[in-house]
């Protein structure tokens, strides 16, 4: 029940009706900013009259505001919320919590050494264990992330999918790394939601990242009883299956072989 100052669902968060803000410890996640652009790439609703649609056009979105700043502790705190919700879903057979299948991080630290953030990187393995894949936007700078470093896309966890940006001709710009960045996705001159009522054309790995997260969600929507039985009985195996389909199903482009895994 929104606004009653009670943790009705027993997940440890009071009145988390709209998501969670880790800085203010409430569900004031904000509207109309960079996050709105990213959310449109994931799941702008189909037939919305705005001439834009997300990769998954009929999906529920969990919004997080990392109000504590970009520190290792605040990042782990933010990721703990979807983890708790997915754990509840797993343990209750879907009666409680939320069926979180992917997170999207259109933020990070350019040039950061992953070895300096061990808890942050290791947390992706924890999320993956419970069935959550995680997507990260690599730097927009023309840097070899394998050499320069990047967070979070420099983390070696299988459950952190590093994504670069590509254009309509499958050319790329910005960060790359054939040991670190899994693949590229559309993120150059893409159209997405903006503000509270409009759309915009924009560029950045920030938009390739949520597009990928939306595709992960779409994969889970495929009506396949055997797959859902696997997801319920072994969430990690379900995530592994989607990850394998995603990484082996990309178009291998000659101009990208030296840029991405």
What is each stretch, according to the model?
Residues 64-65, 103-108, 135-139, 164-165, ...:
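A cross-family glycoside hydrolase active-site/sugar-binding cleft signature
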Residues 63, 90-107, 113, 118, ...:
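C-terminal subdomain of the subtilisin-like protease fold in secreted/lumenal serine endopeptidases
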Residues 35, 39-42, 72, 76-79, ...:
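Extracytoplasmic/secreted envelope proteins and their assembly/folding machinery
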Residues 1-62, 66-67, 71-102, 106-109, ...:
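Active-site core segment of subtilase-fold serine proteases
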């Amino acid at each position: 029940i929104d606004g009653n100052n009670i943790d009705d669902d027993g997940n440890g968060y009071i009145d988390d009706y709209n998501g969670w803000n880790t800085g203010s410890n409430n569900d004031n996640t904000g509207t109309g900013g960079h996050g709105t652009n990213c959310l449109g790439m994931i799941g702008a609703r189909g037939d919305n009259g705005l001439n834009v649609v997300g990769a998954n056009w009929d999906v529920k979105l969990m919004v997080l505001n990392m109000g504590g700043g970009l520190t290792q502790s605040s990042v782990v705190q933010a990721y703990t919320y979807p983890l708790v919700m997915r754990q509840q879903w797993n343990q209750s057979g879907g009666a409680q919590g939320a069926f979180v299948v992917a997170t999207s991080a259109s933020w990070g630290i350019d040039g950061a050494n992953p070895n300096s953030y061990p808890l942050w990187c290791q947390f992706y393995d924890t999320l993956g264990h419970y069935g959550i894949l995680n997507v990260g936007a690599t730097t927009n700078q023309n840097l070899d992330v394998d050499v320069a470093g990047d967070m979070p896309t420099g983390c070696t966890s299988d459950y952190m999918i590093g994504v670069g940006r590509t254009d309509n001709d499958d050319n790329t710009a910005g960060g790359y790394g054939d040991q670190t960045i899994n693949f590229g996705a559309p993120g150059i001159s893409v159209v997405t939601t903006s503000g509270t009522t409009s759309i915009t054309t924009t560029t950045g790995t920030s938009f390739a990242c949520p597009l990928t997260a939306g595709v992960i969600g779409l994969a889970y929507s495929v009506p396949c009883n055997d797959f859902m039985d696997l997801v319920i009985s072994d969430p990690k195996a379900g995530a592994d299956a989607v990850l394998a389909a995603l990484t082996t199903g990309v178009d291998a482009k000659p101009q990208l072989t030296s840029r991405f895994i």
